[in-house]
Amino acid sequence: MNIPPEKMHNLEIKKHSRVDLLLLRSSDFHSFRKLQRDVDEMGLLSSTEQHLSGILTTLDNITDQDNTLYCLTQEGELIGMLKIGTKRLYLYNGKDLHCRSCACLLDFYIQRNFRKRGLGLELFNFMLKDKAISPSRLCYDNPSYKLQSFLKKHFSPCALIKQPNNFVIFAEYFGEPEMGPFGQ
């Protein structure tokens, strides 16, 4: 998975839904296994960097939990990923507790040697456009300091509010009209 940073061409973002992955597994098992190895390895890197005891992202949990995975590849090699899904959460707005189905960013990782090149922002913006959602309408699952800094840098001004369930939301989350998890 080590691609020299100076070779920054042939970048591609691929979206993998549960249905896409099940179809790939049944139609091209070799490609499925390669993707599975790459995603599982990157999921381990992401969890290790966040000092988590378990792995957040594997191809199995994408299909089991009906999440969506966005993969950033260069010349067929995985260099970044972003996992989103819908969760039923209790969110506190400062006065009341609200239970709702929420669009959530569950994992986001770019290989170390590809950071600080705008690739994370490109991947993040691709997901926002694909899901027709704004960053302030997402709930962020226990975001690392790096992710919080990323959000503040690229989507400023933003005040992030920690929730009792370890999710974080933008201060304006409750100020926007409520709709389905992904703008539906």
From Swiss-Prot:
Highest rank taxon of the organism: Eukaryota
Do you know which InterPro entries this protein is assigned to? Acyl_CoA_acyltransferase (IPR016181), Atat (IPR038746), GNAT_ATAT (IPR007965)
Q: Name one GO cellular component term.
A: microtubule
N-acetyltransferase domain boundaries: 1-174
Provide the binding site for acetyl-CoA. Answer: 108-121, 144-153
Q: Which UniProt keywords apply?
A: Acyltransferase, Transferase
Catalysed reaction per UniProt? L-lysyl-[alpha-tubulin] + acetyl-CoA = N(6)-acetyl-L-lysyl-[alpha-tubulin] + CoA + H(+)
Signal peptide range in chain numbering: none
Top EC category: transferase
- Short name of any one Pfam family annotated for the protein: Acetyltransf_16
EC annotation? 2.3.1.108
Q: Which residues are marked as site: Crucial for catalytic activity?
A: 50
Q: Which family does it belong to?
A: Belongs to the acetyltransferase ATAT1 family.
Task: Name the job this protein performs.
Answer: Specifically acetylates 'Lys-40' in alpha-tubulin on the lumenal side of microtubules. Promotes microtubule destabilization and accelerates microtubule dynamics; this activity may be independent of acetylation activity. Acetylates alpha-tubulin with a slow enzymatic rate, due to a catalytic site that is not optimized for acetyl transfer. Enters the microtubule through each end and diffuses quickly throughout the lumen of microtubules.
Q: What is this protein called?
A: Alpha-tubulin N-acetyltransferase
